[in-house]
Amino acid sequence: MEIKYDVSIIVPVYNRENLIKPCIDSINAQTLDKSRWEVIFVDDASTDGSVEVIEKLINENINYRIIKREIPSGNASAPRNEGIKASLGKYVFFLDSDDYIDSKLLENGINIALKNDSDIVYFKMELNARTVTKRPFKHPIVDKADIEKNHLMRTLRIFKMFKTKMLRENNILFDVTVNVCEDMLFGATALLYAKNISILADRDYYFASLHDEPHLSKKKMTLEKLFHIYFYTIQSLYCSNRDINFK
């Protein structure tokens, strides 16, 4: 597929009409030249006015598309996969529809990605005003990160930039049969194939929030499911050719 942009933001949407405004405002505020990126909203058959709100609030100068699914999938995996397949960006970045990002995320992220030919760019993030897992973000900027030394296994959330070519060539997609922590499986698989990984932790770039309303990706899990997620992740890394010391 033709590459037209440096990066594509992929936003899965389901019944977010009352919560999506901060997300769109943060997209509108991005400092990266608008000709260099696009936004792909994938609506998972919302029953409210989410699509109308997006069309009303999004800056008309932004390259954006809305993919409308006719049948709801019930999780974020299928919409994200559609976004990956439709992307025209050299990189993809995943953003949940009720979260928001710093205005410099795209600009700083793509700069370090292009500089280092990064396969993955990690961003420092906050969850409900609490910094998530500080260890990988000990240093403000890391051009070439190491999985073990930089504790990258401690944060497998998918709120990162991923090189689209790496995902497509290795058929890295979200497992649609997994309803919780699907991002951990995706993140672990991407780590298996990533040769260059960079970290941006000079500021908080991604702001995640939790709400009681229905959400595509933030669901509770049983301890049994959590165990299977970690087991699969560790097994995948052990079976790979990566020299990783699990301590």
Which residues does each PLM region occupy?
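Nucleotide-sugar donor-binding/catalytic module of glycosyltransferases
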Residues: 1-246
